Amino acid sequence: MTTQSLETLVETLSNLTVLELAALKKLLEDKWDVTAAAPMMAVAAGAAVGGDAAPAESTEFAVILEDVPADKKIGVLKVVREVTGLALKEAKEMTEGLPKTVKEKTSKSDAEDTVKKLQDAGAKASFKGL
């Protein structure tokens, strides 16, 4: 791309409304199969440079949906909708192209409960500290 076309792109993006930007974000996430989340590893790596300090236990956790057997998909879909509040279409998308993060920045007890619900529905799920 030329500098002029990049400037035109920046100008176009600058004129978008918040709703249009949210729609653009969703389209890019779907197209590239990524999520727009801030990288947490950089913060953790910077804290580890400090030296002898013992690593603190995480207070925030992410729940990861790893696998959904075909015969359990409907039950898992219901649980995903229940724990996330997503609409049917978004919940269905979340159960495809796994692994996917179902919940982020949640407490340990909430993460454990969510994983248990997903596993009871037949999914393979886990949680990890952020």
Curated annotation (Swiss-Prot):
Regions crossing the membrane: none
Positions of the UniProt region annotated as Disordered: 94-114
Cellular component GO terms held in the UniProt record: cytosolic large ribosomal subunit
Gene Ontology MF term list: mRNA binding; structural constituent of ribosome
Gene Ontology terms describing biological process: translation
Pfam families, per the entry: Ribosomal_L12, Ribosomal_L12_N
Key words, A-Z: Ribonucleoprotein, Ribosomal protein
Domain of life: Bacteria
Family: Belongs to the bacterial ribosomal protein bL12 family.
Functional description taken from the UniProt entry: Forms part of the ribosomal stalk which helps the ribosome interact with GTP-bound translation factors. Is thus essential for accurate translation.
NCBIfam families given in the database record: L12
Complexes and interactors: Homodimer. Part of the ribosomal stalk of the 50S ribosomal subunit. Forms a multimeric L10(L12)X complex, where L10 forms an elongated spine to which 2 to 4 L12 dimers bind in a sequential fashion. Binds GTP-bound translation factors.
Protein name: Large ribosomal subunit protein bL12
Gene symbol of the encoding locus: rplL
